[in-house]
Amino acid sequence: MQQMVPASGYDRAITIFSPEGRLYQVEYAREAVRRGTTAVGIKCKDGVVLAVDRRITSKLIDVSSIEKIFQIDDHIVAATSGLVADARVLIDRARIEAQMNRVSYGEAITVEALAKKICDIKQAYTQHGGARPFGLALLITGIDRHSARLFETDPSGALIEYKATAIGSGRPIAMEVLESKYDENMTVSEGMELALYALSKTTEELKPENIDMAIIKDSGKLVEKISVDEIEKIVKAVYEKVKAEEEEAEKNKGEEDSE
């Protein structure tokens, strides 16, 4: 009877499938994403929204030095979750691809074309020895021909388009919020509030200075970073909404108990 190769053998090599058809190193890369900061992306009727909780762990860190949202082109922006160094490499590649498209074809690259190019790079790192997968997920969003696009890429190179989605450690909770609250007809302003509401459910305290947020509106088609002052106003509105929901829940519970 042929002896099975120990699991550790499949564990060490990126190019070898386990008997169950799994690539363990890709799964470990996904685990790096699951431990990363939470990012939320939302398509709205008049644009797109990205928001990330930067999860600052020390008072000594200069918050302005921690970037989680990156402008790729005038009309494309990306949010990252996972290994920071891997993010830097892929963001640089994405920017180069966008520049090359303008030089070669005289026009801006589409959001979908850019997302596919990044996924091709990720996928290649799951097939060749001497390298490891990127421990990184990306939300790539922008405006294409008057319509918003939002793509999620994972370490395997898989690409999925969403109306609203989340990546990182708070994904399960954030997705529950998005599935229950998302409306295709919401405006960018409403999308910003929903994004921060989703993030508030994934952390004990949502601090405005720790939030990185960007929007792109159909009207201007340009990436716009949101200031801390504006984020603070939205966070305040979010917590007022949360407080009202908690009071309503307590009231309903009291009525049920009295019955």
UniProtKB/Swiss-Prot annotation:
Q: Which PROSITE patterns match?
A: PROTEASOME_ALPHA_1, PROTEASOME_ALPHA_2
- InterPro entries recorded: Ntn_hydrolases_N, Proteasome_alpha, Proteasome_alpha-type, Proteasome_asu_arc, Proteasome_asu_N, Proteasome_sua/b
Q: Which GO terms describe its molecular function?
A: threonine-type endopeptidase activity
Entry-linked Pfam families: Proteasome, Proteasome_A_N
Keyword terms of this UniProt record = Cytoplasm, Proteasome
Q: Which GO terms describe its cellular component?
A: cytoplasm; proteasome core complex, alpha-subunit complex
The cross-references to Gene3D superfamilies, in alphabetical order and at most eight, read:
Glutamine Phosphoribosylpyrophosphate, subunit 1, domain 1
Q: How is its activity regulated?
A: The formation of the proteasomal ATPase PAN-20S proteasome complex, via the docking of the C-termini of PAN into the intersubunit pockets in the alpha-rings, triggers opening of the gate for substrate entry. Interconversion between the open-gate and close-gate conformations leads to a dynamic regulation of the 20S proteasome proteolysis activity.
Tagged with keyword Calcium: no
Where does this one sit in the cell?
Answer: Cytoplasm
Q: Is Ribonucleoprotein given among the entry's keywords? A: no
What are the recorded Gene Ontology BP terms? Answer: proteasomal protein catabolic process; ubiquitin-dependent protein catabolic process
- Show the coiled coil region(s): none
Q: What assembly does the database describe for this protein? A: The 20S proteasome core is composed of 14 alpha and 14 beta subunits that assemble into four stacked heptameric rings, resulting in a barrel-shaped structure. The two inner rings, each composed of seven catalytic beta subunits, are sandwiched by two outer rings, each composed of seven alpha subunits. The catalytic chamber with the active sites is on the inside of the barrel. Has a gated structure, the ends of the cylinder being occluded by the N-termini of the alpha-subunits. Is capped at one or both ends by the proteasome regulatory ATPase, PAN.
The record's section on NCBIfam families has: arc_protsome_A, PRK03996.1
What family name appears in the similarity comment? Belongs to the peptidase T1A family.
Q: What does this protein do?
A: Component of the proteasome core, a large protease complex with broad specificity involved in protein degradation.
What name is this protein filed under? Answer: Proteasome subunit alpha
Q: What is the lineage of its organism?
A: Archaea, Methanobacteriati, Methanobacteriota, Methanomada group, Methanococci
Task: Tell me the name of the encoding gene.
Answer: psmA
